[in-house]
């Protein structure tokens, strides 16, 4: 499966990553260096809707603590049938929405484009902090080598 980097369109020097490769780790903005590292590469399966951590494919993006307004995005052990772990990005670019909470999209919290800032699900508002580009690692690597 092809790995992807989920790049912020608010600041293209940043991407989505995790603080560690363990279940329960927070999803945050990270500095995009080269093709990303083990904590910032993702497998994206449009057939299932799972976005799994390339370094540990048993972990996927999930929503924790959803209160009707927002929820923290973490990586959690993949659980079949858990719709908070399913995402829709096909035909929705540049937004990535949650299947269980379809009005909610990945959002860079408080519009703060700084490394370490948390990623939440938040109601769609069209802001730059909700726009992402999914870059295939092989294509990104070729682009960097050609530069």
Where are the language model's segments positioned?
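Lectin-like carbohydrate-binding module/patch detector with strong preference for beta-trefoil
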Residues: 1-147
């Amino acid at each position: 499966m092809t790995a992807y980097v989920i790049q912020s369109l608010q600041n293209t020097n940043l991407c989505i990553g995790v603080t560690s490769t363990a279940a329960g780790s927070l999803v945050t903005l990270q500095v995009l260096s080269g093709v990303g590292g083990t904590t910032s590469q993702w497998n994206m399966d449009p057939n299932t809707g799972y976005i799994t951590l390339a370094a540990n494919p048993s972990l996927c993006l999930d929503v924790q603590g959803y209160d009707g307004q927002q929820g923290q995005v973490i990586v959690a052990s993949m659980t079949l049938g858990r719709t908070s772990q399913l995402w829709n990005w096909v035909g929705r670019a540049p937004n990535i929405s949650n299947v269980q909470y379809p009005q909610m999209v990945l959002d860079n919290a408080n519009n703060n484009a700084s490394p370490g800032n948390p990623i939440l699900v938040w109601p769609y508002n069209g802001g730059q902090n909700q726009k992402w580009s999914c870059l295939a690692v092989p294509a990104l690597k070729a682009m960097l080598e050609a530069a």
